[in-house]
Curated annotation (Swiss-Prot):
This is Nucleoprotein. The gene is N. It holds the Pfam family Rhabdo_ncap. The lineage of its organism: Viruses, Riboviria, Orthornavirae, Negarnaviricota, Haploviricotina. GO terms for cellular component: helical viral capsid; host cell cytoplasm; ribonucleoprotein complex; viral nucleocapsid. Residues 1-17, 39-48 have a biased composition (Polar residues).
Protein backbone atom coordinates (compact mmCIF):
# COMPACT_ATOMS: atom_id res chain seq x y z
CA UNK A 1 0.00 0.00 0.00
CA UNK A 2 1.41 3.40 -0.99
CA UNK A 3 1.82 5.97 1.77
CA UNK A 4 0.37 9.46 1.48
CA UNK A 5 3.01 12.15 1.28
CA UNK A 6 2.89 15.52 2.99
CA UNK A 7 3.78 18.58 0.92
CA UNK A 8 5.23 21.76 2.44
CA UNK A 9 4.09 24.89 0.66
CA UNK A 10 6.79 26.85 2.47
CA UNK A 11 9.82 24.76 1.50
CA UNK A 12 8.26 23.02 -1.51
CA UNK A 13 9.40 19.68 -0.09
CA UNK A 14 7.47 16.45 0.40
CA UNK A 15 7.66 13.96 3.27
CA UNK A 16 6.39 10.50 4.15
CA UNK A 17 3.69 11.04 6.79
CA UNK A 18 4.68 8.21 9.12
CA UNK A 19 4.73 7.85 12.89
CA UNK A 20 6.56 5.21 14.96
CA UNK A 21 4.55 2.17 16.00
CA UNK A 22 3.82 2.29 19.73
CA UNK A 23 3.36 -1.47 20.12
CA UNK A 24 4.13 -4.79 18.46
CA UNK A 25 1.65 -6.08 15.87
CA UNK A 26 -1.05 -8.41 17.24
CA UNK A 27 -0.47 -12.15 17.17
CA UNK A 28 -3.44 -14.36 16.28
CA UNK A 29 -3.66 -17.89 17.70
CA UNK A 30 -4.50 -19.34 14.29
CA UNK A 31 -1.29 -17.92 12.84
CA UNK A 32 0.79 -19.53 15.58
CA UNK A 33 -0.58 -22.98 14.79
CA UNK A 34 -0.04 -22.49 11.06
CA UNK A 35 3.67 -22.29 11.85
CA UNK A 36 3.65 -25.32 14.15
CA UNK A 37 1.00 -27.97 14.79
CA UNK A 38 2.50 -28.76 18.19
CA UNK A 39 1.05 -28.34 21.65
CA UNK A 40 2.40 -25.44 23.74
CA UNK A 41 5.34 -26.35 25.99
CA UNK A 42 5.29 -26.30 29.80
CA UNK A 43 8.63 -26.42 31.61
CA UNK A 44 8.55 -28.18 34.99
CA UNK A 45 11.16 -28.04 37.76
CA UNK A 46 13.73 -30.83 37.54
CA UNK A 47 13.44 -32.67 40.86
CA UNK A 48 13.01 -36.17 42.27
CA UNK A 49 11.04 -34.89 45.27
CA UNK A 50 8.09 -37.22 45.87
CA UNK A 51 4.48 -36.11 46.13
CA UNK A 52 4.36 -37.10 49.82
CA UNK A 53 7.39 -34.95 50.66
CA UNK A 54 6.24 -32.06 48.47
CA UNK A 55 2.83 -32.14 50.14
CA UNK A 56 4.34 -31.83 53.64
CA UNK A 57 6.63 -29.00 52.56
CA UNK A 58 3.84 -27.08 50.84
CA UNK A 59 1.58 -27.32 53.88
CA UNK A 60 4.39 -26.13 56.12
CA UNK A 61 5.18 -23.20 53.84
CA UNK A 62 1.52 -22.18 53.61
CA UNK A 63 1.36 -22.15 57.40
CA UNK A 64 4.56 -20.08 57.43
CA UNK A 65 3.04 -17.54 55.01
CA UNK A 66 5.68 -17.88 52.28
CA UNK A 67 5.60 -20.51 49.53
CA UNK A 68 8.43 -21.23 47.08
CA UNK A 69 6.87 -20.93 43.61
CA UNK A 70 9.16 -23.62 42.17
CA UNK A 71 8.03 -26.04 44.88
CA UNK A 72 4.43 -25.00 44.25
CA UNK A 73 4.73 -25.77 40.52
CA UNK A 74 6.39 -29.12 41.26
CA UNK A 75 3.65 -30.05 43.74
CA UNK A 76 0.82 -28.89 41.48
CA UNK A 77 2.13 -30.96 38.57
CA UNK A 78 2.48 -34.06 40.78
CA UNK A 79 -1.11 -33.69 42.01
CA UNK A 80 -2.53 -32.95 38.56
CA UNK A 81 -0.80 -36.02 37.13
CA UNK A 82 -2.87 -38.16 39.52
CA UNK A 83 -6.18 -36.86 38.16
CA UNK A 84 -7.97 -38.64 35.30
CA UNK A 85 -11.43 -38.17 33.83
CA UNK A 86 -13.61 -40.35 31.61
CA UNK A 87 -13.49 -39.22 28.00
CA UNK A 88 -15.33 -40.51 24.93
CA UNK A 89 -14.70 -37.77 22.36
CA UNK A 90 -11.80 -36.53 20.29
CA UNK A 91 -10.56 -33.13 21.43
CA UNK A 92 -8.79 -31.04 18.82
CA UNK A 93 -7.97 -27.37 18.39
CA UNK A 94 -6.31 -25.75 15.35
CA UNK A 95 -5.56 -29.21 13.99
CA UNK A 96 -3.75 -30.28 17.17
CA UNK A 97 -5.10 -33.43 18.80
CA UNK A 98 -5.35 -32.75 22.53
CA UNK A 99 -7.12 -36.01 23.39
CA UNK A 100 -8.30 -38.98 21.39
CA UNK A 101 -11.56 -40.69 22.24
CA UNK A 102 -9.63 -43.73 23.45
CA UNK A 103 -7.63 -41.75 26.03
CA UNK A 104 -8.58 -40.78 29.57
CA UNK A 105 -8.52 -37.06 30.19
CA UNK A 106 -5.63 -35.57 32.18
CA UNK A 107 -5.38 -31.89 33.21
CA UNK A 108 -2.04 -31.36 31.44
CA UNK A 109 -3.05 -33.06 28.19
CA UNK A 110 -3.03 -29.81 26.20
CA UNK A 111 0.71 -29.14 26.66
CA UNK A 112 4.00 -30.89 26.06
CA UNK A 113 6.01 -31.06 29.28
CA UNK A 114 9.77 -30.64 29.38
CA UNK A 115 12.19 -30.61 32.32
CA UNK A 116 14.10 -27.51 33.32
CA UNK A 117 17.81 -27.63 32.49
CA UNK A 118 19.02 -27.39 36.09
CA UNK A 119 18.33 -29.72 39.01
CA UNK A 120 16.20 -28.11 41.71
CA UNK A 121 16.74 -28.73 45.42
CA UNK A 122 14.01 -27.59 47.79
CA UNK A 123 14.48 -26.42 51.38
CA UNK A 124 12.92 -29.09 53.58
CA UNK A 125 13.33 -27.26 56.89
CA UNK A 126 9.78 -25.92 56.82
CA UNK A 127 7.36 -28.83 56.59
CA UNK A 128 4.26 -30.24 58.23
CA UNK A 129 4.39 -34.01 58.52
CA UNK A 130 0.65 -34.19 59.23
CA UNK A 131 -0.17 -33.46 55.57
CA UNK A 132 -2.14 -36.20 53.82
CA UNK A 133 -3.79 -36.77 50.46
CA UNK A 134 -6.92 -35.18 51.96
CA UNK A 135 -5.09 -31.85 51.96
CA UNK A 136 -4.47 -31.89 48.21
CA UNK A 137 -7.80 -30.35 47.21
CA UNK A 138 -7.60 -27.32 49.47
CA UNK A 139 -3.86 -26.80 48.91
CA UNK A 140 -4.11 -26.92 45.10
CA UNK A 141 -7.09 -24.56 45.26
CA UNK A 142 -5.09 -22.23 47.51
CA UNK A 143 -2.02 -22.22 45.25
CA UNK A 144 -4.00 -21.68 42.05
CA UNK A 145 -6.13 -18.93 43.61
CA UNK A 146 -3.01 -16.80 44.02
CA UNK A 147 -3.27 -16.22 40.26
CA UNK A 148 -6.76 -14.74 40.34
CA UNK A 149 -6.25 -12.77 43.54
CA UNK A 150 -2.86 -11.48 42.43
CA UNK A 151 -4.26 -10.21 39.13
CA UNK A 152 -7.08 -8.30 40.84
CA UNK A 153 -6.05 -4.64 40.70
CA UNK A 154 -8.78 -3.34 43.01
CA UNK A 155 -7.86 -3.91 46.67
CA UNK A 156 -11.47 -4.18 47.79
CA UNK A 157 -12.12 -6.85 45.17
CA UNK A 158 -8.93 -8.64 46.21
CA UNK A 159 -10.16 -8.71 49.82
CA UNK A 160 -13.53 -10.02 48.66
CA UNK A 161 -11.85 -12.85 46.72
CA UNK A 162 -9.74 -13.83 49.73
CA UNK A 163 -12.86 -13.98 51.92
CA UNK A 164 -14.66 -16.12 49.32
CA UNK A 165 -11.65 -18.41 49.01
CA UNK A 166 -11.41 -18.97 52.76
CA UNK A 167 -15.11 -19.80 52.96
CA UNK A 168 -14.61 -22.30 50.15
CA UNK A 169 -11.52 -23.89 51.73
CA UNK A 170 -13.45 -24.38 54.98
CA UNK A 171 -15.81 -26.78 53.16
CA UNK A 172 -12.99 -29.05 51.94
CA UNK A 173 -11.58 -32.11 53.72
CA UNK A 174 -8.25 -31.71 55.48
CA UNK A 175 -6.91 -29.15 57.92
CA UNK A 176 -6.94 -25.99 55.79
CA UNK A 177 -4.97 -22.81 56.43
CA UNK A 178 -6.81 -19.56 55.59
CA UNK A 179 -5.19 -17.19 53.12
CA UNK A 180 -4.12 -13.80 54.43
CA UNK A 181 -3.74 -10.51 52.63
CA UNK A 182 -0.49 -9.02 51.36
CA UNK A 183 1.20 -12.27 50.34
CA UNK A 184 4.33 -11.51 48.32
CA UNK A 185 3.16 -14.17 45.88
CA UNK A 186 0.32 -11.90 44.72
CA UNK A 187 2.80 -9.64 42.95
CA UNK A 188 5.18 -12.22 41.47
CA UNK A 189 3.34 -15.47 40.74
CA UNK A 190 0.97 -14.12 38.03
CA UNK A 191 4.09 -13.02 36.12
CA UNK A 192 5.72 -16.47 36.11
CA UNK A 193 5.16 -17.99 32.63
CA UNK A 194 5.05 -21.63 33.68
CA UNK A 195 2.83 -21.00 36.69
CA UNK A 196 0.45 -19.18 34.33
CA UNK A 197 0.56 -22.14 31.94
CA UNK A 198 -0.40 -24.46 34.79
CA UNK A 199 -3.30 -22.18 35.65
CA UNK A 200 -4.45 -22.13 32.01
CA UNK A 201 -4.21 -25.92 31.72
CA UNK A 202 -6.37 -26.41 34.80
CA UNK A 203 -9.01 -23.98 33.61
CA UNK A 204 -9.04 -25.27 30.04
CA UNK A 205 -9.35 -28.88 31.21
CA UNK A 206 -12.06 -28.40 33.82
CA UNK A 207 -13.97 -26.04 31.54
CA UNK A 208 -14.48 -29.20 29.47
CA UNK A 209 -14.80 -31.67 32.37
CA UNK A 210 -17.14 -29.60 34.51
CA UNK A 211 -18.59 -32.51 36.51
CA UNK A 212 -15.27 -33.48 38.06
CA UNK A 213 -14.89 -32.90 41.81
CA UNK A 214 -11.68 -31.08 40.90
CA UNK A 215 -13.54 -28.54 38.75
CA UNK A 216 -13.76 -26.39 41.88
CA UNK A 217 -10.13 -25.47 41.16
CA UNK A 218 -11.52 -23.03 38.60
CA UNK A 219 -12.27 -20.63 41.45
CA UNK A 220 -8.68 -19.49 41.14
CA UNK A 221 -8.13 -20.05 37.42
CA UNK A 222 -11.26 -18.63 35.77
CA UNK A 223 -9.65 -15.28 34.95
CA UNK A 224 -7.12 -17.07 32.74
CA UNK A 225 -9.90 -17.74 30.24
CA UNK A 226 -9.97 -14.86 27.75
CA UNK A 227 -7.11 -13.04 29.48
CA UNK A 228 -6.37 -9.83 27.54
CA UNK A 229 -9.52 -10.43 25.47
CA UNK A 230 -11.92 -7.96 27.12
CA UNK A 231 -12.70 -6.24 23.82
CA UNK A 232 -13.72 -9.57 22.30
CA UNK A 233 -15.98 -10.56 25.18
CA UNK A 234 -17.56 -7.10 24.96
CA UNK A 235 -19.12 -8.14 21.62
CA UNK A 236 -21.66 -10.30 23.45
CA UNK A 237 -22.15 -7.56 26.04
CA UNK A 238 -22.98 -5.05 23.31
CA UNK A 239 -25.40 -7.43 21.62
CA UNK A 240 -27.22 -8.04 24.90
CA UNK A 241 -27.42 -4.31 25.66
CA UNK A 242 -29.32 -3.74 22.42
CA UNK A 243 -31.34 -6.94 22.68
CA UNK A 244 -30.57 -7.97 19.10
CA UNK A 245 -28.24 -10.51 17.52
CA UNK A 246 -24.61 -9.57 16.98
CA UNK A 247 -24.91 -8.89 13.25
CA UNK A 248 -27.77 -6.44 13.77
CA UNK A 249 -25.94 -4.82 16.68
CA UNK A 250 -22.71 -4.28 14.74
CA UNK A 251 -24.59 -2.63 11.87
CA UNK A 252 -24.82 0.35 14.23
CA UNK A 253 -21.08 0.99 14.01
CA UNK A 254 -20.94 4.19 11.96
CA UNK A 255 -17.39 5.25 12.91
CA UNK A 256 -14.53 4.01 10.73
CA UNK A 257 -12.04 3.40 13.54
CA UNK A 258 -14.57 1.36 15.50
CA UNK A 259 -15.41 -0.72 12.43
CA UNK A 260 -11.71 -1.31 11.71
CA UNK A 261 -11.26 -2.75 15.19
CA UNK A 262 -14.36 -4.94 14.87
CA UNK A 263 -12.89 -6.39 11.67
CA UNK A 264 -9.59 -6.96 13.47
CA UNK A 265 -11.38 -8.98 16.16
CA UNK A 266 -13.51 -10.96 13.71
CA UNK A 267 -10.61 -12.22 11.61
CA UNK A 268 -11.68 -15.71 10.45
CA UNK A 269 -10.21 -19.09 11.40
CA UNK A 270 -9.47 -18.19 15.04
CA UNK A 271 -11.94 -20.67 16.62
CA UNK A 272 -13.86 -17.89 18.35
CA UNK A 273 -17.00 -20.03 18.44
CA UNK A 274 -15.26 -23.19 19.72
CA UNK A 275 -15.66 -23.43 23.50
CA UNK A 276 -12.81 -25.90 24.05
CA UNK A 277 -10.30 -24.11 21.82
CA UNK A 278 -6.81 -22.93 22.70
CA UNK A 279 -7.92 -19.38 21.81
CA UNK A 280 -9.24 -18.29 25.24
CA UNK A 281 -5.90 -19.29 26.80
CA UNK A 282 -3.57 -17.96 24.11
CA UNK A 283 -1.87 -15.47 26.46
CA UNK A 284 -1.19 -17.72 29.46
CA UNK A 285 -0.21 -20.68 27.27
CA UNK A 286 2.28 -18.47 25.44
CA UNK A 287 0.59 -18.91 22.05
CA UNK A 288 0.35 -15.13 21.56
CA UNK A 289 2.44 -12.36 23.08
CA UNK A 290 0.13 -9.59 21.86
CA UNK A 291 -3.60 -10.30 21.95
CA UNK A 292 -5.60 -8.82 19.05
CA UNK A 293 -8.63 -8.87 21.37
CA UNK A 294 -7.47 -6.61 24.21
CA UNK A 295 -8.94 -3.22 25.05
CA UNK A 296 -5.51 -1.66 24.44
CA UNK A 297 -5.63 -2.98 20.86
CA UNK A 298 -9.24 -1.90 20.40
CA UNK A 299 -9.68 1.39 22.30
CA UNK A 300 -12.24 2.83 19.87
CA UNK A 301 -14.48 -0.24 20.12
CA UNK A 302 -13.98 -0.31 23.91
CA UNK A 303 -15.14 3.30 24.25
CA UNK A 304 -18.01 2.82 21.80
CA UNK A 305 -19.39 -0.29 23.51
CA UNK A 306 -19.07 0.97 27.06
CA UNK A 307 -20.37 4.46 26.31
CA UNK A 308 -23.55 2.78 25.11
CA UNK A 309 -23.50 0.54 28.18
CA UNK A 310 -22.87 3.42 30.59
CA UNK A 311 -25.79 5.41 29.22
CA UNK A 312 -27.92 2.28 29.57
CA UNK A 313 -26.77 2.04 33.21
CA UNK A 314 -24.79 -1.19 32.80
CA UNK A 315 -22.55 -1.53 35.87
CA UNK A 316 -19.94 -3.41 33.82
CA UNK A 317 -19.69 -0.53 31.35
CA UNK A 318 -19.82 2.25 33.93
CA UNK A 319 -16.86 0.73 35.80
CA UNK A 320 -14.86 -0.14 32.66
CA UNK A 321 -11.48 1.59 32.58
CA UNK A 322 -11.39 4.58 30.26
CA UNK A 323 -8.68 4.48 27.60
CA UNK A 324 -7.79 7.25 25.21
CA UNK A 325 -9.32 6.41 21.84
CA UNK A 326 -9.08 7.94 18.37
CA UNK A 327 -12.05 9.94 17.07
CA UNK A 328 -13.73 10.18 20.47
CA UNK A 329 -16.25 12.84 19.44
CA UNK A 330 -17.64 10.74 16.59
CA UNK A 331 -17.73 7.68 18.84
CA UNK A 332 -19.72 9.54 21.49
CA UNK A 333 -22.20 10.83 18.92
CA UNK A 334 -22.69 7.35 17.47
CA UNK A 335 -23.28 5.96 20.96
CA UNK A 336 -25.72 8.77 21.80
CA UNK A 337 -27.84 7.93 18.77
CA UNK A 338 -27.89 4.21 19.57
CA UNK A 339 -29.04 4.75 23.15
CA UNK A 340 -31.70 7.25 22.10
CA UNK A 341 -33.08 4.90 19.44
CA UNK A 342 -33.12 1.71 21.49
CA UNK A 343 -34.55 3.33 24.61
CA UNK A 344 -37.31 5.28 22.85
CA UNK A 345 -38.30 2.80 20.12
CA UNK A 346 -39.94 -0.03 22.01
CA UNK A 347 -40.18 -3.39 20.25
CA UNK A 348 -42.77 -5.71 21.76
CA UNK A 349 -44.42 -8.92 20.66
CA UNK A 350 -47.71 -10.20 22.05
CA UNK A 351 -46.59 -13.74 22.63
CA UNK A 352 -49.70 -15.31 24.19
CA UNK A 353 -53.46 -15.24 23.70
CA UNK A 354 -56.42 -17.26 24.87
CA UNK A 355 -56.88 -20.51 23.01
CA UNK A 356 -59.39 -20.21 20.15
CA UNK A 357 -59.37 -16.41 20.32
CA UNK A 358 -58.09 -13.83 17.82
CA UNK A 359 -55.94 -10.82 18.67
CA UNK A 360 -56.98 -7.61 16.99
CA UNK A 361 -53.35 -6.51 17.04
CA UNK A 362 -52.46 -9.25 14.53
CA UNK A 363 -54.41 -7.41 11.84
CA UNK A 364 -52.08 -4.42 12.22
CA UNK A 365 -49.24 -6.50 10.75
CA UNK A 366 -50.82 -5.96 7.32
CA UNK A 367 -50.78 -2.16 7.60
CA UNK A 368 -48.18 -0.58 5.32
CA UNK A 369 -45.54 1.52 7.10
CA UNK A 370 -45.64 5.28 6.70
CA UNK A 371 -42.85 6.71 4.51
CA UNK A 372 -41.10 9.42 6.53
CA UNK A 373 -39.74 12.70 5.25
CA UNK A 374 -36.29 14.02 6.03
CA UNK A 375 -37.45 15.73 9.24
CA UNK A 376 -39.50 12.85 10.59
CA UNK A 377 -37.53 10.54 12.82
CA UNK A 378 -37.70 6.83 11.93
CA UNK A 379 -39.83 4.74 14.27
CA UNK A 380 -37.63 1.67 13.88
CA UNK A 381 -34.42 0.38 15.44
CA UNK A 382 -33.07 -0.46 12.01
CA UNK A 383 -29.51 0.81 11.53
CA UNK A 384 -29.97 1.48 7.81
CA UNK A 385 -33.11 3.54 8.40
CA UNK A 386 -31.28 5.74 10.86
CA UNK A 387 -28.10 6.04 8.85
CA UNK A 388 -30.17 7.12 5.84
CA UNK A 389 -31.96 9.71 7.96
CA UNK A 390 -28.68 11.01 9.40
CA UNK A 391 -27.18 11.23 5.91
CA UNK A 392 -30.16 13.22 4.65
CA UNK A 393 -29.73 15.57 7.63
CA UNK A 394 -25.98 16.18 7.33
CA UNK A 395 -25.22 13.77 10.19
CA UNK A 396 -26.57 16.13 12.82
CA UNK A 397 -28.06 14.39 15.84
CA UNK A 398 -31.73 15.14 16.49
CA UNK A 399 -32.31 17.68 19.27
CA UNK A 400 -34.46 15.13 21.11
CA UNK A 401 -31.48 12.78 21.17
CA UNK A 402 -29.16 15.30 22.82
CA UNK A 403 -31.70 16.20 25.50
CA UNK A 404 -32.51 12.58 26.25
CA UNK A 405 -28.89 11.45 26.51
CA UNK A 406 -27.88 14.43 28.65
CA UNK A 407 -30.41 13.39 31.30
CA UNK A 408 -28.98 9.87 31.31
CA UNK A 409 -25.38 11.09 31.50
CA UNK A 410 -26.13 13.22 34.57
CA UNK A 411 -26.91 10.00 36.46
CA UNK A 412 -23.24 8.98 36.07
CA UNK A 413 -21.94 11.82 38.26
CA UNK A 414 -20.57 9.56 41.00
CA UNK A 415 -18.82 7.10 38.68
CA UNK A 416 -15.44 5.68 39.64
CA UNK A 417 -12.34 7.77 38.93
CA UNK A 418 -10.82 6.92 35.55
CA UNK A 419 -13.85 4.95 34.38
CA UNK A 420 -15.85 5.15 31.18
CA UNK A 421 -18.83 6.22 33.29
CA UNK A 422 -16.92 9.22 34.60
CA UNK A 423 -15.73 10.12 31.09
CA UNK A 424 -19.27 9.99 29.70
CA UNK A 425 -20.55 12.15 32.54
CA UNK A 426 -17.85 14.78 31.98
CA UNK A 427 -18.43 14.86 28.21
CA UNK A 428 -22.21 14.56 28.01
CA UNK A 429 -23.72 15.26 31.42
CA UNK A 430 -21.63 17.89 33.18
Amino acid sequence: MSLSRLYSKKTQSSYNATAPLDRDPPEYPGDAFKKSRNKPTLTRPKSNLSLDDARCMIKGQIQNGSVDIELAKHYLILVLEQITEDNSDDWTSFGVQILSRTERGRPLCMVNIQLDDKDKTFDSQVKDSTATVEDDLWMTTYLLAIYRIGRATNKNYQTQLIDELNKLLATFPGDYVPMVQALQAFDSWPNDPNYCKLVACVDMFFSRFKKSKWAILRFGTISSRYRDCAALTALNHFSRLLGVDLVDALEWSFVGRVSDEIEQMLKPDQELDKVDSYTPYMIDLGISKASPYSTVRNPAWHLFCHTVGSLMMSRRSINARHLEAPDQSNILSNAELIVFVFETRIKWLKNFRKLDSVDASDQLDQVAPVVLGTKDLPNTTNADDWFSWMKLNNFELPDECGRYVSKLAKKLKDSREGSVGQFVYLRLGD
